[in-house]
Amino acid sequence: AAYFESWKSERHYFDSTSKATFEKIQKRLAGYEIGITGVNKDENILILRTYSDKSLGAYYIYNSQDDKMEKIVDVSPWIDENEMSNQLPIAYQSRDGLKINGYLTLPKGYNMENAKNLPVVINPHGGPWARDSWGFNPEIQFLANRGYAVLQMNFRGSTGYGRKFFESSFKKWGREMQDDITDGTQWLI
């Protein structure tokens, strides 16, 4: 399978057996991103790593021959997923028409319809040639737990959006790249 990332990870399968195996795994671990971190020579025993926007996840061993799965260890058993906030995918247009993707994390109990007049932290990623991804971030969860909405945006130049998007950032530091951040703030308001 080939792996790529949009707002969450996605896979393209080259054979029906791999696809069927992964679909079985996904049904059992719904709501989590799943990575295959190891596999035996016969490719029927897999080591899996899960995570989500609310948890660092766990490791599992999966035997595809008998469809048995066993949890090996929770990565962060002290984190209660029920106390964490959802990381929502968002998209907006920059002032020059470029689509900018990102994430909005709202305090628990809020959604896009009822989140009005919340304090907001605008949290652009470093780099600039990096990106924000869907997954657990303790800093973001801390801020949401304290009542802040947190906006993360993948401004022009962020990786994973193709060559044209990447090159649109050349010689644009402090200019269009900054405008993308400002435009995200205006979109949120």
Annotate each PLM feature.
Residues A1:
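Gly/lys/ser-thr-rich phosphate-binding loops in alpha/beta enzymes
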Residues F4-E5, Y51:
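Short loop/turn segments immediately following the C-termini of beta-strands
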Residues S6-K8, G127-P128:
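A short, flexible beta-alpha/helix-coil linker loop
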Residues K8-F22, S55-Y60:
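Structural motif
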Residues T17, R28, Q65-D67:
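Alpha/beta-hydrolase-fold serine-hydrolase catalytic core, especially in secreted/extracellular enzymes
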Residues K19-G31:
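A short helix->beta-strand "capping" segment at the edge of beta-propeller domains
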Residues Y32-I36:
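A short linear hydrophobic-aromatic micro-motif
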Residues T37-I189:
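Serine-hydrolase catalytic core recognition
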